[in-house]
Amino acid sequence: MGISRDNWHKRRRTGGKRKPVHKKRKYELGRPAANTKIGPRRIHTIRVRGGNKKYRALRLDVGNFSWGSECCTRKTRIIDVVYNASNNELVRTKTLVKNCVVLVDSTPYRQWYESHYALPLGRKKGAKLTPEEEEILNKKRSKKVQKKFTLRRKTAKISPLLEEQFLQGKLLACISSRPGQCGRADGYVLEGKELEFYLRKIKAKKGK
């Protein structure tokens, strides 16, 4: 028996049975869930109604995540699934679905922030810098360029919660694309009230 998205197999509201009037139709078909996992990219192409294509991601390990307040979007590695409002089973099996909360690698965002503001981010006090990082952060600049960075630094403040995550090297992000439909796991970095909300939820789950 195929997966069917009809409603004539259900009983009537009165509890009586319905006699099937026709066989299952092609337009009523359903397909098994993608259950996208974290791993080297594996995507299947599916031919769907109208000759269109869907991209069923079976495994993904990177995605495009946008840091909204800084208008910075970077491709970064997905590390882990930490929360899912709809189903804890999907967290246990590390399944990537829309609106699940994941941990992503913070390195691309830190590199962008340091080159944009020429300020260190997510570094422990007195940590050694590599020659390249030294070049970016403590470079001799002309007065004109220095003025530009000074102006930028007025808006360089980020929230303590985000700073804490940068120290750990991982950011909480939310997936906003549908991996089983478009074959991508793209989303946004959690900030502000939304970040506080999910941190509370994750903490409550750990406490159980």
From Swiss-Prot:
Keyword Zinc attached: no
Q: What GO molecular function annotations does the UniProt record carry, in alphabetical order?
A: structural constituent of ribosome
Per the record, its GO cellular-component terms are: cytosolic small ribosomal subunit; membrane; nucleolus; small-subunit processome
What kind of membrane protein is this, topologically? Lipid-anchor
Segments of this protein annotated with the region Disordered: 1-27
GO terms in the biological process aspect are:
chordate embryonic development; maturation of SSU-rRNA from tricistronic rRNA transcript (SSU-rRNA, 5.8S rRNA, LSU-rRNA); regulation of cell cycle; ribosomal small subunit biogenesis; translation
Task: Kindly list the places in or outside the cell where this protein is found, as annotated in its UniProt entry.
Answer: Cytoplasm; Membrane; Nucleus, Nucleolus
Q: Subunit notes for this chain? A: Component of the small ribosomal subunit. Identified in a IGF2BP1-dependent mRNP granule complex containing untranslated mRNAs. Part of the small subunit (SSU) processome, composed of more than 70 proteins and the RNA chaperone small nucleolar RNA (snoRNA) U3.
Protein name in UniProt: Small ribosomal subunit protein eS8
Q: Give the source species.
A: Danio rerio (Zebrafish)
